[in-house]
Curated annotation (Swiss-Prot):
Disulfide-linked positions: none
Record's catalysed reaction(s): uridine(55) in tRNA = pseudouridine(55) in tRNA
Species this protein is from: Corynebacterium glutamicum (strain R)
Gene for this chain: truB
Top enzyme category: isomerase
The protein, known as: tRNA pseudouridine synthase B
Free-text function comment from the UniProt entry: Responsible for synthesis of pseudouridine from uracil-55 in the psi GC loop of transfer RNAs.
PANTHER family: PSEUDOURIDYLATE SYNTHASE TRUB1, TRNA-PSEUDOURIDINE SYNTHASE
Keywords attached to this entry: Isomerase, tRNA processing
Domain of life the protein comes from: Bacteria
One Pfam family of this chain: TruB_N
Family (UniProt): Belongs to the pseudouridine synthase TruB family. Type 1 subfamily.
GO annotation terms (biological process): mRNA pseudouridine synthesis; tRNA pseudouridine synthesis
Active-site residues from the entry: 44 (nucleophile)
Length: 297
């Protein structure tokens, strides 16, 4: 007999440094004994911290996960620019930054806060004509990614150190999805005319999920357990709409309900606590956008 499929849900991983996000997925596929594993929001190999991973039907929920905001703790080194905008690339220029005025640094940080246009780093997972930018760079192609709007709501300096010709900043950033912290380091260095790159990055929040929810990968490999089942994942991510058990059955079969004047997506929850689906008003219908518990399962 085949082993039963793992329960669907989310695993919040505290990713270690030195591996790709796909490496984490591969290890969790083995740990949970299923191919149905995927992640939301790529973390670079050098980065650590929150990586949201879906298991079984949880992979389908990832596309609907509210992750409009993310938070990071990072270290920026001013005085050197690299080919990748982080410590893993080759140093392409150096300029003595030890004499920088801290007030000038804070002024340029202020210019990189709020609604800004950001040019993503060339070595990124962004697809250009179906091929990821970092693959094109590796193959020797010239890559030019247009600037895009992002929001940096917090860009705070927690500490700083002057080390020889370098000026290191420990920073905390809260930003919209799609913001590159490496690009912030690069742009800050360019604005100060000394170059800059990222030397450390730890993601502390993805939407409603934080490091407090996260489990080290090594522990998950030893004891593979969900961080949240689908009911918990939906209600943690969206406002709740209470429905009857009968309405839950209808939604589980893909049927729609009468509109109730709702704005935005809600998690439809029955009296028994089952988050049956994500629903949204579309015209004169309250329709499903994701069914967590289909009637066929």
């Amino acid at each position: 007999m085949n082993a039963p499929a793992p329960k669907p849900g989310l695993v919040i991983v505290d990713k270690p440094a030195g591996m790709t996000s796909h490496d984490v997925v591969s290890k969790l596929r083995r740990a949970f004994s299923t191919r149905k594993v995927g992640h939301a929001g790529t973390l670079d190999p050098m980065a650590t911290g929150v990586l949201v991973v879906g298991i079984e039907r949880g992979t389908r929920f990832l596309a609907h996960m509210v992750a409009s905001t993310k938070a990071y703790d990072a270290t920026i080194r001013l005085g050197a620019a690299t080919s990748t905008d982080d410590a893993e690339g080759e140093v392409i220029s150096t300029t003595d930054a030890s004499g920088l005025d801290h007030r000038a640094i804070l002024a340029e940080i202020a210019n990189l806060t709020g609604d800004i246009m950001q040019k993503p780093t060339k070595v990124s997972a962004i697809k250009i004509d179906g091929k990821r930018a970092h693959e094109r760079v590796r193959d020797g192609e010239e890559v030019d990614i247009p600037a895009r709007p992002v929001t940096v709501s917090v860009f705070d300096v927690l500490d700083y150190r002057v080390d020889s010709e370098f000026y290191d900043l420990d920073v905390r950033v809260h930003c919209s999805s799609g913001t590159y912290i490496r690009a912030l380091a690069r742009d800050l260095g360019n604005a100060l005319q000394v170059g800059g790159h990222l030397t450390a990055l730890r993601r502390t929040e993805v939407g409603p999920f934080t490091l407090n929810d996260a489990t080290p990968l090594s522990k998950l490999q030893e004891n593979p357990e969900l961080s949240l089942n689908l009911d918990q994942a939906l209600t943690r991510s969206y406002p709740v709409l209470d429905i009857t058990e009968d309405e839950g059955v209808d939604l589980s079969m893909g049927k729609w309900l009468e509109p109730r004047g709702l704005k935005g997506v809600h998690a439809a929850v029955t009296p028994s606590g089952k988050a049956v689906a994500l629903i949204e008003e579309k015209g004169k219908r309250l329709a499903t956008v994701f069914v967590a518990h289909p009637n066929t399962l």
